[in-house]
Amino acid sequence: MKHFVFLVALVCVLCASLNPVKAVSNTELQDTSRFARIISKGDTGGGDGKYIELSTIRDNSTDAHTKNIEAKIYVVLPSSDLIREYKVRYDYDLNLSLANMVAKASKLKTRLPDFSLHELWNIKMMESGIVGMVLNQQDYTLNGESKQTQPALKGYENVTFLTPTDFDFESYHVANRVFKMVYGTFYDDVVR
C-alpha cells in the first residue's frame, strides 16, 4: 500500500511539473522582448490594457481566402486586481475586408444604381469578416499569482474583452491589430 501511495504521489508531481500553470504578473507584461501592448480605443489610461505574448502568435492559415491566427492575449484590470489570460483564435475572411469591399463597390454600383458606400458600412456592421473564439482562459492577480477563473455565464461563453468581433467595437480593433502584427498591414487594408 505504501508503494501505491508513493507511486500516486510521484505521478501527481510529474504531471504538475509537465503541465505547469505559468502565471504572469503586471511587471512581466512590461517586458517588451516577450510582450507587445495592443493599443486600443478601450484603454482608459488607468493602468489597464491588453498585451499579446509574442512567442504564442501562430499563423495557422490554410488557404488564400481566409487567415487564421492564434495567440495569448492578456487583459489587465487593475481595479479588480486581475490579469485575464485568453488563448484566442481569430479567423479573417479577406473578402470582407473594408478595402476589398470598397474596391468592389463600383461593380455593385453598376448592378444596383441606388447602391452607396454607406451600404458597405451596414454590411460590415452585420458581418465584420472576423470571427474570434476564446479557446482557453486563466486568471491571475496583478502580482502574478493564479486566481480561480470564474466560469462564463451559460450562453455568454464567447462574450469577453476580445470576442465577439463586431465591426467598430473594441474587440474588432484588437483583432485588427493582431492581424497587423502577423501580416504587416491591417485586416481592413487588404485588397484581394
Model-derived features with residue positions:
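N-terminal secretory-pathway/extracellular module detecting exported/lumenal segments
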Residues: 23-87, 91-192
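Bacterial Sec-dependent signal peptides at the C-terminal "C-region" and cleavage site
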Residues: 15-23
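Bacterial N-terminal signal peptides
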Residues: 8-16
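Positively charged n-region of N-terminal signal peptides that target proteins for export
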Residues: 1-4
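Intrinsically disordered, low-complexity segments enriched in polar/charged small residues
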Residues: 7-8, 182
